């Protein structure tokens, strides 16, 4: 494998090596070479006072073999855009960053670092601004964003040729989101709604205000039907809507009642300020009674079991972790290894799990000409391994 600068020049057999005069030769007998890993759902944030702690996460990703991250919006969008530029220019050490910039939300949302939109005209202005920043995709969340404006944002983004990622509003079905052109669904638990024959009924009740989202989730779990799930996932695949599972972060939160993370070795790599942002989920989970805890467990397990069905129905599974601030004990770097380990545990093959972390991310972003394999013209983002990851 011949490298020049940040690119692979050629992949040749030994007999062809005499055509080249390398300045340096690295011999790796008995080792395995593969493309760098991608974590396609990370966050940087916690306020301006935590910029330095977030910046320290960049080499941590590299130390775990993660050469590319997709930033799904925190509350430091301008800082991340600057890092993207500096890393691309070779001025900052870190993984290649693809970012959404600030996410779209409704008026006065829970989340910080958002562009608040309340009218179609404001959606237009927001997308104008994001395009001017040359963001890599548009992130949309549903805390206070009106469902009709969510669909409007997807429509306008698709007209502009902008890729989209988002959460699923409780007032809309997955079919509606796929029809509107949503590129990736972030967090696999959202798919549970589409696994019941009662999806439309439950969605309508939530939209009418006669049922809460949590109640609808409980009803969805109780009325799970695999043929319905397969039909829904085939629909997503046909529309080109992918899934970023973020299973590891979901698992950590689901089992906070059973597992003590206060002595995790990975905590030593997380700054004190970022560690403090973990508290809110821990404190919220501590207030759950036995029934709520049981639902947390059931929701995670049922969600995770959908993974092989998604694969079988042709949905593109893109590895992402939700690592970063706020998401308790979901450690940048390590989390991706835990994530793809769960993919195998819940039914994917090692090869499929690796494809989710190497090939499917660049495919979503239209970057397979540069990433996803060890081949001429691709980025020289390479990992050297002691063992065969396919085994």
Show the residue positions of the predicted features.
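Divalent metal-coordination and catalytic microenvironments
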Residues: 1, 6, 30, 38-41, ...
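Histidine-rich, glycine-flanked metal-binding segment
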Residues: 1-34
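Acidic, glycine-enriched loop/beta-strand segments at the rims
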Residues: 13-15, 301, 331, 349-354, ...
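Metal-associated gating/positioning segment near the N- to mid-region
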Residues: 31-91, 109-110, 115, 121, ...
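Divalent metal-dependent hydrolysis catalytic cores, especially in the metallo-beta-lactamase
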Residues: 57-78, 95-103, 131-145, 162-165, ...
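Active-site gating/metal-coordination segments in enzymes
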Residues: 102, 106-163, 210-223
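Active-site neighborhoods of metal-dependent hydrolases
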Residues: 126-141, 191-346
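Divalent metal-binding pocket/active-site signature
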Residues: 136-186, 227, 247-250, 299
